[in-house]
Amino acid sequence: MAENDSWDADDFEPEVSNQKGAVSGPPPAGRDRWEGEDEEEDVKDNWDDEEEAEAATKQEAQKTVEPKVSEKKKLLEKIREKEKLHKKRQEEVNQQEKEGTAPELSPEEQLAEKLRLKKLQEDSDLELAKEAFGDNVTVTGIDAMNPSSREDFTEFGKLLKEKITQYERSLFYPGFLEVLVREVCVSLEVDDLKKINNSLTVLCFEKQKQEKQQSKAKKKKKGVVPGGGLKANMKNDLEDYGGMDEGYGREYDDFM
């Protein structure tokens, strides 16, 4: 009877066996999935997370590539724009020269203007290089020098000489140097100016000696034309004789 009473009890729940193959009771509250279903869902969620991570990585890579491409395009556009402006400016100058409307400049001013335009072009190229490769562009030549010692100024002078003597064949070169030397020597003391003047005077004497030697060498190369001197002397003698004969004739006429 006791067993029957336990079966008839309202709150009776069958015992759940922990052994394999035993029938288990109803799933606990909140669990509506079969055994192993949660694991499959977790694996699926992991796959989705990996795909999303890969997609995000690709997007970031594209974002890093796109700015580089756009910067390169911008740089090319700037280069083309500067080339167009330079070409347009050159065409305007040529047109003004043809029409005669270009401003009249002295030879020194014309050479200075050419140097100024060349310097602007070099500065423009340097700025483009900085934009292309960053501020870590290595500057060489005169622009990179900041002389402070005697050796530095010697090297600086060599580079400056190479830069200026590129235009020594120009007709405006001597006048340009005259103005340049005067301008750069304005702030010097009198003693320093005397030293520079003496150096230029010595250079002038040396050039004069060279010119004299060259002129003598040219005369020696010409030589004497065969018979030329003899013919000249005979001509002079005949002229003298003719002059005497002409005087004798006049005296005879006067006597008659």
From Swiss-Prot:
InterPro entries in UniProt: eIF3-like_dom_sf, eIF3j
UniProt protein name: Eukaryotic translation initiation factor 3 subunit J
Gene of this entry: eif3j
GO terms under biological process: formation of cytoplasmic translation initiation complex
Keyword Oxidoreductase: no
Main location: cytoplasm
Compartments where found: Cytoplasm
Entry GO terms, CC: eukaryotic 43S preinitiation complex; eukaryotic 48S preinitiation complex; eukaryotic translation initiation factor 3 complex
Bias (Basic and acidic residues): 55-101
SS bonds (residue pairs): none
Family: Belongs to the eIF-3 subunit J family.
Regions annotated as coiled coil: 70-99
Native source organism of the sequence: Xenopus tropicalis
Sequence segments annotated as region (Disordered): 1-109, 214-237
Subunit structure, interactors included: Component of the eukaryotic translation initiation factor 3 (eIF-3) complex, which is composed of 13 subunits: eif3a, eif3b, eif3c, eif3d, eif3e, eif3f, eif3g, eif3h, eif3i, eif3j, eif3k, eif3l and eif3m.
Domain of life: Eukaryota
GO molecular function, one term: translation initiation factor activity
Annotated Gene3D superfamilies: Eukaryotic translation initiation factor 3 like domains
Pfam families for this protein: eIF3_subunit (PF08597)
Keywords assigned: Coiled coil, Cytoplasm, Initiation factor, Protein biosynthesis
